[in-house]
């Protein structure tokens, strides 16, 4: 018998299975099996008859439910009808939600607000599918694409990247006009402004469906930090970050999904901008406040690294480190701070804001592209396209309506009116290949200039030269010689026997562990101390102890002002009551620690650390209720950054297996070098029809432009109006949909030509749905005034906080890897062709409606799981990731997470596609190291900044012990400190860290599959 397809309210489809009718009736109404099966048979018979006579092929679950209710009424079961009634979800579905919660969104906890949200969502999503154009609804149900945030389809845009200067200048109207809440004047202090920014996040959470962020956070806050101590600044930042994480008011009780971008250096684009200060008054320019910006930068990173009150990392706001040209040249200042913290704090993100190094003087090939303004319309055109527009003659063609992007000697990027368009006769061209896969084409007679140094080099003389000069700074450090008498004193404090015997001149160690026994024996021998060694049986413990007897006169308090005595004291204390993980084990704040119930000993330990320059933190641990006879103890955590490790590895510790890994330069020197850009290859090219250039006062920029990354994966390139303020601030992504690339390939039977035809059809469906949603939200914001927070105006310009015309509308995609696996006879660069096709559709849509379209690598959380389930249901032999029931697709254009290729392969893959996903993408580098080397991260970051990758993160799993509040960058089952199994494992879901227990089935499987690299 032919199949009938059942369509669920969430859009998913499955084959009609009559047995599910009786099962659902029994589950939801409690009726007996005989009645349920009788109703099942009637309905099945009716549907198959409709199939045979009327060609019925599809039926919704709502229609089946209505038929069940009709049959129950006929049987006289009125209460059962009530139980079967559908209000967005059935009674049993709602009861299941009450009992078990939902894992569609890992950022939502199991709370009453979550229940309320999902109850509402059931109604709103069903209405959205019913109200949107039918072909858009059908495409979602079939799994060809996914409409995100359908519960807010008619009501909310997606995300927002704020310019905090708006609130610094204008104050805050929490409802947009002051009728429903108090109106705040411009803040006069750092603390008040941060509170305004927090309240703006909260208000925004009621009108956006996604994330919110503040760009250039430290740079734009810097004016408010003038005259404040670092302690005051840090306290204010600490309050802001804690409050962001304590505000569970977002869409079902979620934590505020937020981010802040912090600049390693003051952006050139802000240096000469008026600085908005206390009271909204201009006070100089932002370039005057680099020192204050650096203090805020430091405070944000330190607060993030110090974690919360129970030792867990802060989940929000996501901290985005903006890296610009020159920021990574020297390992000092902000660069050193970022990498010392970022080596082991897995919550940071990195943003490549460095300008492209494709600035050249010369004559270019016809297919070289550049940014131009023609009649004030921003275009990205090749020289050949410009030639065709101008119908230019050979030589110079005067132009009056064209501006080109240029750079001056001070590295300022500005628009310049072109004087002439130059079209030359054919001549020799060369392709210049630089490090980091950069390249350009020009003629041999011209020089090239980089943004960084502005040095002119003749093309043919550059083959073996560096464009920038490399320099090395050696900072010699003194070598410690730990005093062994002080080592004995420290070790005895922890493991020696004290009391009356000691006062009578007798000292002894009573040791069990072999490494401690060897350590004590070697210490006593090295100091030429006479001792007796005996094996003593301890009946209560049923073990043999090794006891060393010697004179208590040998235990002498060391000179606490001598650096080598302090090094010896620290060695002894760490070897007794300290704990150092094999190979540098723990994460940065827990690579080494000291525990004692004697506060005198902990004071000595901290004094030694302080004088030796080892950073530490400590906390008093109270015994639990079932440990009545236990004393409180103090745990001191050593911060094992480069400097601390350099000192610790000079200490003499018990058995070398407990020593910190020798992972830093043994010569104890800092090596800092400037970023060098070398010419790798010069390739002569065949002659072309013509070569081109513009005649302008400054050097033109060819290639791509500056990019700023905002929330989630949304990137806002400066390619809309050319204005940083308009294109990147107080704007964001309006909405996006995700295309199921593997399903489109499978529906095309693997035929490449049919695939592109089908992809074109699905893109057109996406266009119709996104435009329909845009019109709905415009009505909500501007006609119904449901989101007036967004419409509050700047007091000078009158411009609203939010302008929907500047937002991006986005085509997203999922499963490019599986798509390529499902196509036949593809070319080596088929993945690029697919994304270029999506970009061509984006341009086509822009020409159609003049709106700001983009392409994004979707942050698919539940979507990747949903798509894979649909694919396996329709094509059981299809290639997806995971195992049965826990299927998922590879995220966007990523390599599968289980791939064990080295990190370079993952970076190259991201670079390959990055320029084709200017709407946003992220590179996840999954690390398996408990403690990473900061210099290795620095070196890798320098390489990534030289590439076309714009947004990346080093993601580590970490585990938190709920018993003793211990955190470790590892996935463990038993706490190494207290032995508890009451642990919570965290890992990155998409754009934030969450407990893995909150992941959906597909994401749980992905977590298990992730191959974790070591640097």
Feature-to-residue mapping (PLM):
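Protein maturation boundaries and topogenic segments
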Residues: 364-386
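Long, charge-rich boundary regions
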Residues: 977-1015
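Conserved alpha/beta enzyme-core scaffolds, especially Rossmann-like or related mixed alpha/beta domains
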Residues: 38-66, 207-227, 231, 235, ...
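Charged, amphipathic alpha-helical regulatory modules used
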Residues: 1-101, 1008-1012
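Conserved catalytic cores of very large enzyme subunits
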Residues: 98-363, 712-805, 832-985
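Extended active-site and interfacial segments that coordinate phosphate-rich ligands
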Residues: 21-30, 277-298, 368, 386-387, ...
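Secondary-structure capping and boundary motifs in well-ordered enzyme cores
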Residues: 13, 60, 485, 561-571, ...
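Internal intein/HINT superfamily modules and their associated LAGLIDADG
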Residues: 391-395, 401-711
């Amino acid at each position: 018998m032919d199949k009938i397809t059942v369509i669920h309210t969430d859009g998913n489809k499955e084959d009609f299975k009559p047995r599910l009718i009786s099962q659902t009736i029994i589950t939801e109404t409690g009726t007996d099996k005989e009645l349920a099966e009788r109703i099942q048979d009637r309905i099945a018979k009716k549907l198959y008859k409709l199939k045979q006579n009327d060609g019925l092929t599809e039926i919704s679950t709502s229609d089946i439910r209505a038929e069940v209710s009709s049959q129950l009424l006929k049987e006289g079961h009125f209460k059962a009808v009530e139980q079967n009634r559908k209000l967005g979800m059935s009674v049993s579905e709602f009861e299941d939600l009450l009992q078990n919660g939902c894992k569609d969104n890992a950022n939502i906890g199991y709370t009453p607000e979550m229940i309320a949200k999902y109850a509402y969502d059931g109604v709103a999503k069903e209405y959205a599918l019913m109200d949107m154009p039918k072909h858009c609804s059908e495409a979602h149900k079939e799994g060809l694409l996914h409409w995100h945030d359908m519960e807010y389809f008619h009501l909310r845009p997606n995300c927002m990247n704020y310019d905090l200067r708006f609130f610094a200048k204008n104050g805050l109207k929490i409802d947009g006009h002051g009728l429903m809440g108090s109106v705040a004047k411009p803040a006069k202090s750092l603390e008040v402004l941060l509170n305004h920014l927090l309240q703006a996040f909260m208000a925004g959470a009621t009108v956006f469906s996604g994330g919110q962020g503040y760009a250039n956070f430290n740079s734009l806050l810097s004016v408010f930090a003038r005259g404040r101590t670092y302690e005051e600044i840090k306290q204010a930042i600490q309050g802001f970050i804690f409050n962001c994480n304590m505000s569970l008011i977002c869409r079902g009780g979620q934590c505020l999904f937020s981010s802040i971008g912090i600049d390693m250096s003051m952006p050139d684009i802000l240096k000469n901008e008026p600085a908005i200060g206390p009271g909204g008054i201009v006070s100089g320019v932002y370039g005057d406040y680099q020192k204050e910006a650096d203090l805020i930068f430091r405070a944000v990173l330190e607060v993030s690294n110090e974690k919360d009150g129970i030792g867990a990392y802060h989940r929000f706001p996501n901290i985005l480190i903006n890296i610009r040209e020159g920021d990574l040249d020297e390992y000092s200042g902000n660069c050193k701070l970022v990498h010392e913290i970022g080596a082991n704090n897995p919550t940071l993100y990195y943003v490549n804001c460095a300008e492209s190094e494709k600035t050249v003087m010369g004559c270019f090939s016809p297919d070289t592209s550049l940014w131009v303004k023609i009649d004030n319309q921003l275009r990205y055109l090749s020289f050949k396209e410009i030639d065709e527009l101008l119908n230019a003659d050979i030589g110079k063609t005067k132009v009056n309506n064209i501006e080109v992007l240029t750079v001056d000697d001070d590295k300022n990027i500005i628009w310049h009116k072109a004087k002439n368009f130059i079209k030359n006769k054919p001549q020799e061209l060369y392709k210049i290949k630089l490090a980091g896969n950069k390249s350009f084409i020009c003629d041999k007679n011209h020089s090239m200039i980089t943004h960084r140094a502005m040095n002119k080099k003749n093309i043919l003389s550059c083959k073996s030269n560096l464009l920038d000069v490399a320099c090395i700074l050696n900072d010699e450090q003194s070598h410690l010689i730990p005093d062994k008498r002080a080592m004995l004193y420290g070790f005895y404090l922890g493991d020696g026997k004290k009391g009356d015997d000691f006062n009578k001149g007798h000292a002894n160690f009573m040791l069990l562990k072999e490494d401690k026994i060897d350590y004590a024996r070697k210490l006593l021998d090295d100091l030429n101390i006479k001792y007796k060694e005996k094996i003593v049986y301890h009946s209560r413990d049923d073990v043999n102890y090794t006891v060393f007897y010697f004179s208590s006169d040998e235990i002498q308090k060391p000179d606490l002002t001598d650096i080598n005595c302090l090094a010896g004291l620290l060695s002894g204390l760490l070897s007794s009551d300290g704990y150092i993980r094999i190979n540098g084990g723990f994460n940065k704040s827990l690579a080494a620690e000291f525990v004692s119930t004697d506060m005198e000993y902990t004071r000595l330990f901290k004094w030694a650390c302080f004088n030796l320059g080892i950073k530490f933190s400590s906390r008093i641990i109270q015994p639990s209720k079932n440990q009545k006879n236990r004393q409180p103890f103090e745990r001191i955590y050593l911060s094992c950054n480069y400097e601390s490790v350099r000192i610790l590895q000079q200490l003499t510790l018990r058995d070398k297996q407990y020593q910190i890994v020798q992972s830093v330069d043994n010569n104890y020197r800092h090596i800092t070098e400037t970023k060098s850009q070398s010419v790798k290859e010069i390739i002569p090219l065949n002659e072309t029809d013509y070569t081109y250039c513009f005649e302008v006062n400054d050097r033109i920029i060819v290639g791509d432009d500056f990019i700023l990354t905002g929330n989630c994966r949304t990137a806002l390139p400066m390619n809309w109006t050319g204005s940083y303020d308009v294109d990147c601030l107080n704007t964001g992504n309006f909405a996006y949909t995700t295309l199921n690339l593997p399903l489109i390939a499978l529906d095309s039977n693997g035929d490449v030509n049919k695939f592109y035809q089908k992809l074109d059809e699905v893109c057109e469906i996406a266009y119709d749905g996104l435009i329909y949603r845009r019109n709905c939200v415009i009505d909500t914001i501007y006609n119904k005034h449901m989101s007036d927070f967004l419409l509050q105006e700047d007091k000078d310009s009158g411009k609203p906080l939010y302008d929907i015309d500047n937002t991006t509308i986005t085509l997203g995609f999922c499963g490019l890897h599986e798509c390529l696996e499902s196509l036949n006879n593809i070319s080596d660069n088929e993945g690029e062709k697919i994304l270029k096709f999506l970009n061509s559709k984006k341009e086509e849509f822009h020409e159609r409606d003049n709106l700001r379209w983009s392409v994004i690598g979707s942050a698919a959380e539940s979507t990747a799981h949903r798509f894979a389930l649909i694919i396996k249901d329709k094509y059981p032999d299809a290639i997806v990731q995971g195992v049965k029931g826990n299927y998922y697709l590879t995220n966007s254009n990523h390599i599968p997470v289980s791939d064990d290729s080295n990190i370079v392969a993952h970076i190259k893959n991201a670079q390959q596609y990055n320029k084709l996903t200017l709407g946003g993408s992220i590179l996840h580098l999954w690390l398996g190291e408990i403690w990473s080397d900061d210099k290795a991260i620095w070196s890798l970051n320098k390489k990534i900044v030289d590439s076309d990758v714009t947004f990346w993160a080093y993601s580590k799993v970490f585990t938190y012990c709920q018993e003793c509040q211990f955190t470790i960058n590892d996935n463990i089952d038993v706490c190494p400190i207290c032995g508890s199994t009451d642990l919570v494992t965290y890992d990155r879901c998409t754009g934030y860290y969450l407990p893995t227990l909150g992941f959906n089935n597909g994401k749980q499987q992905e977590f298990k599959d992730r191959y974790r690299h070591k640097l």
